[in-house]
């Protein structure tokens, strides 16, 4: 009788809300280890099956999920790595990982952002720091707390190798969490980074209708994403429009919260200091403008966050745009 293949061990790097949620999902499918920096968080996960700091006391995690603060243990035992650390710490963690990780282990990013200074996507950083390791991204319209509470949701796993993507998608799939696949890594990553900036714009409000901002934001997202090599078919899907809608409308959206606080007149440094999680749109706003395309919504968000503009000035800047062709025009 042939020996049964063992389940691959998933190692999730990062102890935030989405990393923990994905780790708990994976633990229901097979052996999963979560690396966190905080001993308190590790103990909470191991002893109470909770991550109270990021998901509150009501969300109960899989009782088979185990957490560790030992990075070497995590890296040395991984068959699949899932990275949930913020974009500003992503490269540093991968550099540590490169010293310990076995060859060819796939690396799937949960991060929806771009690296400041290089403008690189997370999968590009994986390819640079961990050559030979298949890189992918799990993207889609997911608010961590809602998925952790069991609401039905979906995501797309983007990898160049669709055979591998199909195999790995089963590690994340449950009855209530649907996982599709695509080979458009560029489109999925660009959509994930861009939607955070547009959610800040929605949060700022100032008499701009949500439907108007979302519709025009989708045009800007598609424009830059396609220019970077993404497929136009990706942006009306889960990683694009789906994630854009949920991030712009959910009361649990961190990036929308930043926009609301900006609209209330608070300075960006004060807003960031008051949050215990990262809003990737704050960093992505300046990176997006470096690509040099005409993107009025992103331009005004960047002006408010990084150049001292007010929300009222941002509103006036958008309203001053002359409407042109809905699809081919470059204005708002």
Curated annotation (Swiss-Prot):
Matches recorded under Gene3D superfamilies: N-(1-d-carboxylethyl)-l-norvaline Dehydrogenase, domain 2, NAD(P)-binding Rossmann-like Domain
InterPro entries: 6-PGluconate_DH-like_C_sf, 6PGD_dom2, G3P_DH_NAD-dep, G3P_DH_NAD-dep_C, G3P_DH_NAD-dep_N, NAD(P)-bd_dom_sf
Classification via Pfam families: NAD_Gly3P_dh_C, NAD_Gly3P_dh_N
Cellular component aspect of the GO annotation: cytosol
The reaction(s) this protein catalyses: sn-glycerol 3-phosphate + NAD(+) = dihydroxyacetone phosphate + NADH + H(+); sn-glycerol 3-phosphate + NADP(+) = dihydroxyacetone phosphate + NADPH + H(+)
Function: Catalyzes the reduction of the glycolytic intermediate dihydroxyacetone phosphate (DHAP) to sn-glycerol 3-phosphate (G3P), the key precursor for phospholipid synthesis.
Protein name according to UniProt: Glycerol-3-phosphate dehydrogenase [NAD(P)+] 2
